[in-house]
A protein has these predicted regions:
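Active-site rim/loop-helix segments in enzyme catalytic domains that contact anionic ligands
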Residues: 1-139, 271, 282-285, 290-293
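Metal-dependent de-N-acetylase/amidase catalytic core
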Residues: 1-12, 109-308
Length: 308
């Protein structure tokens, strides 16, 4: 145990690519600083849309081999970020991507035809217990996952939120599954977020650049869907601008899911490290560390007196 990093971060995500989009720069920063970073991915993203024409045969309605391919993409993304500890919840293939449909109001909802092994249908206690084993092994001081809406409402994101929160609770219960190791209570839990002001700023730049298709229907001066967080509820912004290039490399590794030649990516590249390197969070358990001039905490590990 002498090689165990003093500070340890655990992230729970639904599909390969979610981690790189949301916290890629934060992950790379903490790895570079010698802090432990563990990623748990709940599914292999089998139901994802394939954006590479020559790989369309991998899709769920064709060869149904996308999950295996995305496993490789995720490994490449983790290599780009420097992360060496990645696990699939319960082991690869335990839970399958549930798929989704779009509601008329613009948020994601469960698809009509869901696979029997879909993560959305997973037994919550069983899935959370898989996470308990990871928590008690890694003993993280910080957990990052989605909010109760799962960000934009994808059923697997919502389920990942439930599993992460319940798993954290069970991991800290001394009488629960002693065979899985000594109880460990995670001191700080964050929900990943994007502030409304930051989203409005990005939307305005997209519209000024003539892009009306990215985030179609959203007006930078109009109401925003609940996937964005009111500024007063944001507690933390990690400035990992020095690691923006690693985040971009990780995004490019998820080639079947993320196109890097569209207007959104081009505009973000023009903004450089500011666009890719600042990642926001909302503390839901634990004590905030020191605040900066912007009124936000700048380090997820801030305020942890005894790393344990």
């Amino acid at each position: 145990m002498t090689d165990t990093p003093t500070h340890r971060l655990l992230l729970v995500h639904a599909h390969p690519d979610d981690e790189s989009i949301g916290q890629g720069a934060t992950m790379a920063k903490y790895v570079a600083e010698g802090r432990g970073v563990t990623l748990v991915t709940c599914t292999a993203g089998e139901m994802g849309e394939v954006l590479v024409p020559e790989l369309e045969h991998l899709a769920a309605d064709k060869d149904d081999r996308l999950g295996e391919h995305r496993k490789g993409e995720l490994a490449d993304a983790m290599a780009a970020l420097g992360v060496t500890d990645h696990r699939f919840l319960g082991g690869f293939g335990t839970y399958r991507d549930s798929g989704m449909a779009w509601h008329e109001d613009g948020h994601a909802i469960p698809a009509d035809d869901i696979h029997d092994n879909a993560f959305w249908h997973a037994d919550l206690t069983e899935a959370a217990t898989h996470l308990v084993q990871v928590v008690r092994e890694v003993r993280p001081q910080v957990l990052v996952t989605y909010d109760q809406f799962g960000g934009y409402g994808h059923p697997d994101h919502i389920q990942a939120h439930r599993v992460a929160m319940y798993g954290a609770l069970l991991a800290g219960a001394p009488s629960y599954r002693r065979d899985l190791g000594e109880a460990w209570e995670i001191p700080k839990i964050y929900w990943a977020c994007i502030s409304e002001s930051r989203m409005r700023e990005g939307l305005r730049k997209l519209r000024e650049a003539g892009d009306e298709t990215t985030f179609e229907g959203m007006d930078p001066d109009g109401p925003l869907p609940p996937m964005f967080t009111k500024d007063e509820d944001v507690t933390t912004e990690v400035d990992a601008s020095d690691y923006a290039d690693q985040k971009i490399a990780a995004l490019k590794a998820h080639a079947t899911q993320i196109t890097t030649d569209g207007p959104f990516f081009a505009l973000s590249n023009n903004e450089g490290a500011t666009a890719w390197g600042r990642e926001q969070y909302r503390l839901v358990k634990g004590r905030l560390g020191p605040m900066g001039e912007n009124g936000w905490e700048s380090d997820l590990f801030a305020g942890i007196e005894d790393p344990g």
